UniProtKB/Swiss-Prot annotation:
Broad class of the protein's primary localization: membrane
Impact when changing residue 121 to A: Drastically reduced affinity for sphingosine 1-phosphate
Effect on the protein upon substituting residue 265 to L: Impairs sphingosine 1-phosphate binding and signaling
Name assigned to this protein: Sphingosine 1-phosphate receptor 1
Protein species of origin: Homo sapiens
Biased composition, class Basic and acidic residues, residue ranges: 351-366
One GO term of the biological process aspect: adenylate cyclase-inhibiting G protein-coupled receptor signaling pathway
GO CC annotation, single: presynapse
Keyword Transmembrane helix: yes
Assigned protein family: Belongs to the G-protein coupled receptor 1 family.
Side of membrane Cytoplasmic, spans: 69-82, 139-160, 225-257, 311-382
Annotated Polar residues bias: 371-382
Length: 382
């Protein structure tokens, strides 16, 4: 027993010491070929970094305004808007994390310990993972809300807490796996070229997870659209012409929103997914495209800038509130003004707009399912 226990202790100590060994960064970057690339093109990286940092600043400010809009507008203190707020928070952190990543890149990379390097890259994985999981949480909430509006209404505060908590817990675990041991510090031949301290198996695992998330989001939004179309056909069958035509308009608006959501998501993330798959399959120093990974990553980060536009600014009332925040106009009675400007007849609130952009759901239970998501609007039944 004695002789076998000594090597185990030594192995543990050496692995811990590796996390504070500055030479490991240089060794891994030299093995993958990124050491020479970064030395040869240091000036161009600085120029592109400035552009990328400006993009990140825009993303940060954009999402701060979204959070302020939700916080200062009482009518947005509902579960669905909390999901949008969580998405804005994760997108904001993605912008902050990528800015820090850029500032700590280049020559600064070789002054980092492996532990600091894992924190630099892990923070990006956590923020981007939280953003993607937030998109999935919004899709789940919209789908469940539609089903509950057909069956029965109940409190969804627990579901709100559960989904948001799961979003961050899973993201933290996913981003923390390399620093917890799933890395290639002691296995150079298994190292990623894009991220030289990450194991290729970890890269493949993350790519698989994100691909499954994308498929889940696609399936959920297709199911939402299918439910709306089913409702529209049912109204047509009952010869309820006014409701059927209104439902048909909402279905078309919903279809456009679904196409926008999925197209933007795929356009931003698919190139990075493909690059990471190439990283897993290519042998070291054989795929030159892997040395241009920053352009693929910034495209994924751009999704954090498009999310506020898709999920909030297409909502008419959120757009108005957003403009009020930007113009620094304090409207204490702004939340209740909309209620008194519309006549209330027989317990029903009528919107002045004939479009589906209003986020006030009609009291008619038959119309509720279609108002869940139309033209970017999101409403909760809570």
């Amino acid at each position: 027993m004695g002789p076998t226990s000594v090597p185990l202790v030594k192995a543990h100590r050496s692995s811990v010491s590796d996390y504070v060994n500055y030479d490991i960064i240089v060794r891994h970057y030299n093995y993958t070929g990124k050491l020479n690339i970064s030395a040869d093109k240091e000036n161009s990286i600085k120029l592109t970094s400035v552009v990328f940092i400006l993009i990140c600043c825009f993303i940060i400010l954009e999402n701060i305004f979204v959070l302020l809009t939700i916080w200062k507008t009482k009518k947005f203190h509902r579960p669905m808007y909390y999901f949008i707020g969580n998405l804005a928070l994760s997108d904001l952190l993605a912008g902050v994390a990528y800015t820090a990543n850029l500032l700590l890149s280049g020559a600064t990379t070789y002054k980092l310990t492996p532990a600091q390097w894992f924190l630099r890259e892990g923070s990006m994985f956590v923020a981007l993972s939280a953003s993607v999981f937030s998109l999935l949480a919004i899709a789940i909430e919209r789908y469940i809300t539609m089903l509950k509006m057909k069956l029965h209404n109940g409190s969804n505060n627990f579901r709100l807490f559960l989904l948001i908590s799961a979003c961050w817990v899973i993201s933290l675990i996913l981003g923390g796996l390399p620093i917890m041991g799933w890395n290639c510090i002691s296995a150079l031949s298994s190292c990623s070229t894009v991220l030289p301290l990450y194991h290729k198996h970890y890269i493949l695992f993350c790519t698989t997870v994100f691909t499954l998330l994308l498929l889940s989001i696609v399936i959920l939004y297709c199911r939402i659209y299918s439910l709306v179309r089913t409702r529209s056909r049912r109204l047509t069958f009952r010869k309820n012409i006014s409701k059927a035509s209104r439902s048909s308009e909402k279905s078309l608006a919903l279809l456009k929103t679904v196409i926008i959501v999925l197209s933007v998501f795929i356009a931003c993330w698919a190139p990075l997914f493909i690059l990471l798959l190439l990283d897993v399959g290519c042998k070291v120093k054989t795929c030159d495209i892997l040395f241009r990974a920053e352009y693929f990553l910034v495209l994924a980060v751009l999704n954090s800038g498009t999310n506020p536009i898709i999920y909030t600014l297409t909502n008419k009332e959120m757009r108005r509130a957003f403009i009020r925040i930007m113009s620094c106009c304090k409207c204490p009675s702004g939340d209740s003004a909309g209620k008194f400007k519309r006549p209330i007849i027989a317990g029903m609130e009528f919107s002045r707009s004939k479009s589906d952009n209003s986020s006030h759901p009609q009291k008619d239970e038959g119309d509720n399912p279609e108002t869940i998501m139309s033209s970017g609007n999101v409403n909760s039944s809570s």
